Design a protein with these regions (language model features):
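Short, glycine-/small- and polar/acidic-enriched structural segments
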Residues: 2-138, 142, 161-167, 180-186
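Conserved C-terminal helix/tail region of periplasmic/extracytoplasmic solute-binding proteins
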Residues: 270-288
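Pocket-lining segment of extracytoplasmic ligand-binding domains
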Residues: 138, 147-232
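Residues within well-ordered alpha helices
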Residues: 25, 66, 124, 172, ...
Length: 288
């Protein structure tokens, strides 16, 4: 049995992995795929890849691109979710802030340095700077909160003013009157990719190829699974109508990241001063 460790966020995007593991699809191919939930998100998963504590990460595109250019010994082997991630911009329910304009000069709660929540705060500030003078990405301030529970506390205590997280996963907190959503910020690129440590690719490329084949078949069929909306709503504590909207907006991919898209992502990260140099397509991407 080939043991492979994989990490991802405990969110609805990753249910196809759990279904494939539970149904024994990997086991039939002599693969023991060991899943670890990482609620801290992309910054933490980058560290797990660097430390050799996971072999594969299902990870935010912008985060892993940034970290590979900074020396993470991993490669992107495929896009996992083609559609953008819709980041909700949230404040405490009783906050004095009502519009995105009000957030200029305030503090963003982020899970970790280098996380999607930090990188997208730069994207949002850049978007706002085009609409309103006075917004500058250099003025952004951050409070590290690790998880969504940490963000709840930070916004409640006033140590941070707003928090960006996937809109639908955060919706229950809005429904409960804990957060109030004042805007959205979709990623300008496919949201999730599959990244693998180079050492694993060199030694077990055939196993990684089998894993891709299995998950791709699962995601192709995923939306056609009977009552999948009910399954998702129950598992992730969502309203059925929210899950149905999310399903209509979400498109899984079975294709490799294209060079033009990688170039677009890196150009924007350079413009935002998140990276200072671009990697080549070969530096970042490998097809198995």
């Amino acid at each position: 049995m080939n043991t492979i460790k994989i990490a991802g966020v405990p969110e609805h995007f990753n249910l196809p992995w759990h279904l494939a593991i539970e149904s024994g699809d990997f086991e039939k191919e002599n693969i023991d795929l060991q899943w670890t939930d990482v609620p801290e998100g992309t910054g933490k998963m980058c560290q797990l890849l660097r430390d050799g504590e996971t072999d594969i990460a299902v990870i935010l595109t912008e985060g892993i691109v940034k970290d590979i250019t900074a020396g993470n010994p991993s490669k992107i082997i495929q896009v996992y979710v083609e559609s953008p991630l819709i980041w909700g911009i949230h404040v405490a329910a009783n906050s004095k802030y009502n519009t995105l304009t009000d957030l200029k000069g305030t503090t963003a709660a982020i899970s970790r340095l280098g996380s999607g929540s930090q990188l997208m705060a730069y994207v949002n500030a850049d978007n706002q700077s085009r609409l309103h003078s006075g917004w500058k990405t250099d003025d952004l301030q951050f409070e590290i909160v690790n998880t969504i529970d940490g963000a709840v506390q930070a916004l409640k205590n006033g140590t941070a003013d707003y928090f960006m997280w996937e809109r639908f996963m955060t919706k229950p907190l809005v429904d409960q009157g804990i957060f109030r959503r004042i805007g959205d910020c979709p990623t300008p690129w496919p949201c999730f990719v599959i990244a693998v440590r180079k050492e694993v690719l060199e030694k077990q490329a055939d196993v990684i190829s089998k894993i891709l084949s299995i998950i791709n078949q699962t995601t192709v069929d995923f939306k056609n699974i009977p009552s999948i909306d009910t399954t998702l709503a129950l598992k992730y504590h969502q309203k059925i109508e929210d899950i149905q909207e999310w399903l209509s907006l979400t498109h899984w991919s079975q294709n490799q990241l294209k060079a033009e898209m990688l170039n677009k992502i890196q150009n924007q990260l350079i413009q935002l001063k998140i990276i200072d140099k671009k990697g080549t397509f070969e530096d970042l991407v490998e097809t198995v």
